[in-house]
């Protein structure tokens, strides 16, 4: 083999090694981002489950004190029943937002009932649900950050080439609905 042929073979091998390195590095980075998104959603799901478990206690505590507001209590129960952790993430997010809206409606109605506002059990449950809502918001921010990083990564070169090869699609954000942007007062 001549020195020129050896040099050409080395150059081709080096270029192939660099291309392979870039592809593997980008593939691994995308896989890591996908895992972070899944973990971030799992963290949200834990808090959604905790809130899901607290809602019957809140409805039960309020039901006896608010005999005339069954529609609001029914809305909370319906929103709770609609949530299922086995659904795809976008549907889970929609049901989580519906539950948040129903709980906020309940808290707004509770404001009209002094006997409910002063009930210690209701106050404790409201504090716990508000704490969980705050945790959901924090974890939603982390989830959306990971989704942003992933979506940005798969839409830029050279990773977009891998994305088209492997069928990677942008992930949906867990976005706040307009009525969620401003928190209503919930002091009991």
Where are these regions (language model features)?
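A helix-centric hydrophobic-segment signal that preferentially recognizes long
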Residues: 2-188
